[in-house]
């Protein structure tokens, strides 16, 4: 329905930057974000689409889980009018998606600190349990080192954060607690080597981060017509290609 109205010019959406394609909506497994101009007229168009969807699908819009986000330049009167139309609350920021905030500015370190806090909390819970070396290995590989994967798919995280995460994980592996120090018999670099080479096969987080970004880069290179490629090209390399950006 949204695509049809967009094709009929009933719904325009918003551009990320000058020359970028217009985006009217983004669909997630359990969520949907609709973009439009902050006006009463555009609000009416959205409500008509939603009413039609409710009628044809038999599903109802949960207004308690619906929220409105406005630009700082939107006047208060328009915000209140649209709010009354939808019967939803106005928020200053959307909830996190897979641990990552929807808006990440230049100061990325603050957004990424949540990763370290998550890993620290998980490790703190594990330290109170009697775990074998095999159990520690599974928790490190399946949970601790998997926690930052989504963020690493999108951003190059600072080397300092990689070092801090490695330190937390290394201390857990060697059984070190807050008020005691234990000797690490092997460097973490060697622990990250494959088992066939004498290591434990743990991830080198810096290399893993670069590998994930390279994979995304290859997807962009192979799919120049995709929405994400067109948006990034308009924003970062309008006069060149991805390999030259």
Question: Where are the predicted features?
Answer:
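A helix-boundary/hinge signal
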Residues: 1-245
């Amino acid at each position: 329905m949204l695509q049809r109205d967009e094709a009929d010019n009933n719904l325009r959406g918003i551009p990320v930057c000058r020359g970028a394609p217009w985006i009217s909506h983004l669909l997630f497994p359990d969520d949907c974000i609709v973009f439009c101009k902050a006006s009463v007229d555009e609000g009416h168009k959205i409500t008509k689409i939603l009413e039609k969807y409710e009628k044809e699908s038999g599903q109802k819009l949960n207004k308690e889980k619906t929220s409105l986000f406005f630009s700082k330049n939107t006047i208060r009167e328009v915000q209140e009018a649209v709010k009354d139309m939808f019967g939803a609350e106005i928020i200053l920021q959307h909830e996190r998606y897979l641990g990552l905030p929807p808006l990440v500015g230049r100061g990325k370190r603050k957004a990424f600190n949540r990763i370290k806090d998550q890993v620290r909390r998980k490790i703190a819970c594990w330290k109170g349990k009697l775990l074998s070396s095999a159990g520690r290995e599974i928790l490190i590989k399946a949970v601790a080192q998997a926690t930052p994967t989504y963020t690493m798919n999108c951003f190059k995280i600072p080397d300092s954060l990689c070092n801090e995460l490695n330190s937390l994980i290394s201390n857990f592996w060697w059984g070190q607690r807050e008020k005691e120090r234990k000797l690490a018999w092997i460097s973490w670099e060697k622990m990250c080597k494959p088992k066939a080479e004498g290591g434990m096969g743990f991830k080198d987080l810096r290399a893993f981060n670069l590998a994930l970004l390279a994979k995304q880069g290859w997807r962009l290179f192979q799919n120049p017509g995709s929405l994400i490629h067109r948006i990034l090209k308009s924003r970062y390399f309008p006069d060149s290609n991805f390999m030259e950006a």
